[in-house]
């Protein structure tokens, strides 16, 4: 749950009465623990576990992707046979590490985030896992860096040559990211958006008291969800995993 534009320091104190540290929308803590203990944590690579535990102690650790979400991300990448990928919103790199581990030896992930300091926390784990060579980290705001990437691809004579993209960044810009990524990800490729249920606020009545940040992000996510549902350029599937994940497959 990263912002991608440097909003991280203010988020934790800007939430409404929402438990932003809760990594699941499941109503049963026991059921979520069962999922984690049965099929997720026993298969979590040691390097990912170590990074997750260190990030949990970070003052913004609640922004970290959940272990079951990271497992799903790795599975999607392998099922898609992805080789060239994009990640918008990195934080300490837990989901980035999951991506790098899932990619083939010659795979590459362009990772974009304005917060290099947080990325540096996770970089030693990428190196220890032997996958740092797969990561092309680009410090800066998501929209600007994606525009630069579009220009680079055009200069190299490549059009829509990425296989996969994962977005966990500033929610008000998700709709703009979608248009950029549709130009970067190939037909048949996938774009995955995180936090598409925003702690359940998307289903609350309009007059529900919310903090300014939660209202702004919830409105942005509802707008995204409506647009994705009506977008004829993609297949779309929304899952109630973690804080909501939406998987898009480009059709045209």
Swiss-Prot record:
**An example molecular function term from Gene Ontology annotations:** metal ion binding
Do the record's keywords include Methyltransferase? yes
Give the matching InterPro entries: Cation-dep_OMT, SAM-dependent_MTases_sf, SAM_O-MeTrfase
What cofactor does its activity depend on? Mg(2+); Mn(2+); Co(2+)
Entries under CDD domains matching the protein:
AdoMet_MTases
Q: Where does S-adenosyl-L-methionine bind?
A: 65, 87, 89-90, 95, 113, 170
Q: Which UniProt keywords apply?
A: Magnesium, Metal-binding, Methyltransferase, Nucleus, S-adenosyl-L-methionine, Transferase
Q: Which GO biological-process labels does this protein carry?
A: methylation
Q: What functional role does this protein have? A: Catalyzes the stepwise methylation of tricetin to its 3'-mono- and 3',5'-dimethyl ethers. No 3',4',5'-trimethylated ester derivatives are produced. Can use caffeoyl-CoA, 5-hydroxyferulic acid, luteolin, tricetin, quercetin, myrcetin and 7,8-dihydroxyflavone as substrates, but not naringenin, apigenin or kaempferol. The 2,3-double bond and the O-dihydroxyl group of the substrate are both required for catalytic activity of the enzyme.
Check the record and name the PANTHER family matching this protein.
O-METHYLTRANSFERASE-RELATED, TRICIN SYNTHASE 1
What name does this protein carry? Tricin synthase 1
The species is Oryza sativa subsp. japonica
Q: Point out the gene that encodes the protein.
A: ROMT-15
